[in-house]
Amino acid sequence: MAAGAAVTLGGGLSACGSRGDVARAGTTDQWRQFQGATLNFISENTAPTAAIAANTKPFTDLTGINVNIVTLELTALVQRVALDLASGRAQYQVIYADPYQVLAPYQRGLVDLRTLEADPNLPRLPGGIGDFIPVQMDAAGRFVDPAAYYALPYDAPTMIWQYRQDLFAKYHDRMAHDLGFDPTPGGERTWEEYFRIAQWFNKNATSDVKYGTGHQARQHDSLMNDFSNVLWSYGGAYFDHGKEVGRLGARDPGPCRLDSEAAIAGAEFYNRLLSIADPASKTWDWDGVGAAFRAGRLAMCPNWHEFAASNEQVLPGKVGYAVLPKGPVATANMYGGTGVGISANTMPNERGAAWLFLVWATSPETQLANLKSKAGGGTPTRTSVYELPEVRAAEKRPSSMPNMLTAAAVRQAWTPERIGLRPKIPMWNECNTAIFTQLSTMLSGAETPANAMRSIKSRVDRIVARGWVA
């Protein structure tokens, strides 16, 4: 472990210290004014945090600040953060602020970072907030107020079409002849064509793969993500003004709209698609479908783009990446990114120290280092990093940064017309559980798609009607 960092997996902190503000040194060096301080960062166990935890020495050398990092599964993290914010103390000064389970429900417990960016005694963000990809800045950093921001974009997993390009090349002409269209994956393909491609592989390529497609359709958050891409492409929405509710959020989103004809049509297609997918799809989350794809079981799957690095280790040169297909109305690629924020319970100087960490952790230099890290990595959230010559070069094989092989696909996926944003509402966690539970019932055959959508609407409306107090 690098000097200056202590990582605790699923446990408590080392060196929490007594409650009291950190000292501020009399120095003109903005980066050294809180030397000797210790920060506690609580994060989900993600790729960028793994990379940072493996190498916090540059931050400690720059600032004199030590960092303790606690990594937890997301549900446990949310519980720990909620308790810490309610306590009035800041055991964790730096918080991995999941937009849907931390930012939306607990926004009042996070610092409006504009106050720190405007402080002349603190370093400014290199490139300002304008260097962050705009839709990510809104989705991961803001809640309701379009001016305030409570987190800086930190990671950006996004669902895209992952496919065996070696098999698509091998069978291209036969598929094109049999199907009557060019099967090459891309945004011009439709979900109906995706279905037919999967069906073709099921019938004609069993010597290479067992199934044409696989999905993260376990009764889990992954099922909501996988379904939502189809829902939105068919014109369905969870609530009115779905793009706005996803991008900036809402405290009261109004009635659920999953009983609409468009939503039901999307559910009917999704149910039909899963009927020809690998049957094990109903037991897989994103890790499960990713492992099955790497094992050579599937010709293609929708999955998070950050699986590219592990794909390249197992299937070097054999995997292609594209945006997800379009539906009758739209196209959507689910975004799962998160920001890092600062607890509003922090005292003035420890708040300043936490700001130094946020500026460093999201800086272009650190994001580039994370891309190269053997411990993790993720993908950058800043436009300037994607413009660096060495990052551009890594978009093509052979690549020293294999997640960059997805760059062309995710750049398209992050445009406002293609990005898929789930509702950013305070009660989303409970709504999400209702959604994936009922979807799982539908996939089991115990409920029709229409009845499943109506059941979800009824449950979500009751959840939203109760409101949220934090």
Residue locations for each model-derived region?
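Extracytoplasmic/periplasmic substrate-recognition and gating elements
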Residues: 40, 86, 143, 147, ...
